[in-house]
Amino acid sequence: MYVPTQEGEFSVDEMRNVVLGKQIAKNEFKPWWACAAGFAVGAGSVLYIGAYENRPILSLAVPIVYATGFSFVRPTKKGIIKRHPEYQDNEYFVYGYQNKGRRKIMLNTIIGTLGGMVVGSVTSLALKSTGNITYIVRP
């Protein structure tokens, strides 16, 4: 039950629209691209910077900076209106959708980045243990 207690808080109808936006984003917004891009950055930085250039600290810093930057990304208002034209003039629905969407993007980015770093590290260790490292691009 929601009851606004201070001036400047959402009214009951406004909060209903915010919650509706969050619920719809939770059920239908699937930012798979954030996970895939995070995986590519995580694995690529560990393999290339960590193994090829032999800079392990930098290879860990790149995915962390990438994931931090992606924590500010959110679904666009234009994209939300395209999927839900009936809420075109409802800024509270858009706010709720963007709020939940931002969290899902951040979580998927972190999961993908950590997964990529693990896969990149295991692959790098496997390549180093065999001693036969063949790089596609030579300096």
Regions inferred by a protein language model and the residue ranges of each:
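Hydrophobic alpha-helical membrane segments
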Residues: T5-P139
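Periplasmic N-terminal soluble interaction domains immediately after the signal peptide in Gram-negative
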Residues: M1-V3
